[in-house]
């Protein structure tokens, strides 16, 4: 049985790691195409975002603005988390909202774990209880390539 934890480890964590390495190793202004690839924002979308915001180059701050506005799964998670000011403790409702998961599987996972709130460190336990088939996320047996 594949779980949301499998998806998170294969799809989201490598993307976060690649962004972290990029931001630590590259100096702004950042290359627009690389940023688009990292955030999985199609070129037409990021070009439109840059034009709407009248941005000619990407700094660290603009990188995160683009991340909030992008439509990729990670961008959506980032946007929803920042809307909630990156909570220290997560209720099932907050987990479902941030990670775009159906509420019932998250509530079931919380009941199975006997917890009402979760720290960042506890999220993998919650994710491991949510069957991927219950989510909207596809799973590929081919690992994500790290850019």
Protein language model features and the residues they cover:
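Short helix-capping/hinge SLiMs at alpha-helix to coil transitions
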Residues: 24-26, 84-86
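Short helix-start
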Residues: 50-85, 114-147
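Helix-turn-helix DNA-binding helix
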Residues: 46-47, 106
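DNA-contacting interfaces and partner/effector-binding or oligomerization modules
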Residues: 1-11
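Short alpha-helical "recognition helix" segments of helix-turn-helix
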Residues: 34-36, 95-96
């Amino acid at each position: 049985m594949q779980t949301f934890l499998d998806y998170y480890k294969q799809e989201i964590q490598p993307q976060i790691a690649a962004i972290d390495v990029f931001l630590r190793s590259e100096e702004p202004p950042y290359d627009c195409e690389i940023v688009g690839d990292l955030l999985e924002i199609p070129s037409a979308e990021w070009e439109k975002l840059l034009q709407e915001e009248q941005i000619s180059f990407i700094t660290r701050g603009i990188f995160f603005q683009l991340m909030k506005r992008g439509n990729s799964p990670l961008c959506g998670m980032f946007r929803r988390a920042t809307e909630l000011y990156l909570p220290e403790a997560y209720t099932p409702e907050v987990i479902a909202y941030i990670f775009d998961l159906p509420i019932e599987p998250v509530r079931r996972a919380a009941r199975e774990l006997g917890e009402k709130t979760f720290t960042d460190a506890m999220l993998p336990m919650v994710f491991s209880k949510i069957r991927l088939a219950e989510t909207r996320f596809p799973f590929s047996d081919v690992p994500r390539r790290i850019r």
